[in-house]
């Protein structure tokens, strides 16, 4: 078996320390793999050089922005996926893509071991390792942060002692994960639930309590569930996310302060920013309200929740998720049209929707002249619909 270790590299504290630590403690060569998911910040060339400076024998950078948008963000929209009705799976959907590219790098660079920098308290360890087991069960997994009980203080001390080029201090110990779909911030004083987030935590959104300028009205167009236009201009999925990140972020839309149930059994607090994601999910959900038949819509809302739970729990490659997506593909056949939304003061308000596939019938819905609804049929419908309840009540009154 090869002694090379293929490491999922973010450029942050834990994975930078991991490169040096693996080399010093095990003698194995490390190939660092950094994936560009549209996270912005440092240039990927800088991240690549940092990996080399930390001791990696090779550092691979993969531009996966379009792949991430089309293959991972889009399914999140199609499934209206909000874990616990709030979290749009910012980090969760990125992990299976990283796993895919780490496995590819292991095959290309002769690696028999894959490594990640996740702790034993988080969900990401599960997402990575279940992903590896699904795609490459022959690979060994190394998790130094978890298996050797690193704390952030220990990692910072190791970085300082070994001159690892990483900008993290004990006074600013936030853990940040970001991509084009959103941004997640945790640890530090945020671990105390009563502490309000400070302004410096946010990067994707403006302060909605200050920016009370002109509201931004945007029209998002869909074809078979897929976002295809913004204000009538054709866009790719990536371009749609980027445009709505910019516009919704300027209005303070997409800030989320969440206490969520982690897979490992604990509750954790996360601060999320996902302006474009929240606009797209809101618009898509609204268009489904117009185009899906009642029973289909009801059932899909159940599968939406289950899909979000599967992805959150690291089961991206599971048979159930694949089966749900086959169902969802069928539901999207008529989800075409446009939704108009107003973005302002941190809020999203839908104020218009139109679709050639709409099930809304004006003549049936109107209370004015032209009403074509046969109200004489209502009496019998109400009687039959409530008959079982009536019979049960009659029995209970005996």
UniProtKB/Swiss-Prot annotation:
Q: Which reaction does it catalyse?
A: L-citrulline + L-aspartate + ATP = 2-(N(omega)-L-arginino)succinate + AMP + diphosphate + H(+)
Q: What's its EC?
A: 6.3.4.5
Where found in the cell?
Cytoplasm
Tell me the subunit arrangement. Answer: Homotetramer.
Q: What name appears for this protein in its UniProt entry?
A: Argininosuccinate synthase
Q: What class of enzyme is it?
A: ligase
GO terms (BP aspect):
argininosuccinate metabolic process; L-arginine biosynthetic process; urea cycle
One Pfam family assigned to this protein is: Arginosuc_syn_C
User: For L-citrulline, which residues are the binding ones?
Assistant: 87, 123, 127, 175, 260, 272
- Give the family per the record: Belongs to the argininosuccinate synthase family. Type 1 subfamily.
GO CC entries: cytoplasm; cytosol; plasma membrane
Protein's pathway: Amino-acid biosynthesis; L-arginine biosynthesis; L-arginine from L-ornithine and carbamoyl phosphate: step 2/3
Instruction: Name its species.
Output: Mycobacterium tuberculosis (strain ATCC 25618 / H37Rv)
Query: Does the entry annotate any disulfide bonds, and if so which pairs?
Result: none
Q: Which residues bind ATP?
A: 8-16, 117
List, in alphabetical order, the Gene Ontology terms for molecular function in this entry: argininosuccinate synthase activity; ATP binding
What does the UniProt keyword field contain?
Answer: Amino-acid biosynthesis, Arginine biosynthesis, ATP-binding, Cytoplasm, Ligase, Nucleotide-binding
Q: Major location, coarse class?
A: cytoplasm
Q: Does this entry carry the keyword Magnesium?
A: no
Is Amino-acid biosynthesis among the key words of this record?
yes
Instruction: Tell me which InterPro entries the record gives.
Output: Arginosuc_syn_C (IPR048268), Arginosuc_syn_N (IPR048267), Arginosuc_synth (IPR001518), Arginosuc_synth_CS (IPR018223), Arginosuc_synth_type_1_subfam (IPR023434), AS_cat/multimer_dom_body (IPR024074), Rossmann-like_a/b/a_fold (IPR014729)
Residues that bind L-aspartate = 119, 123-124
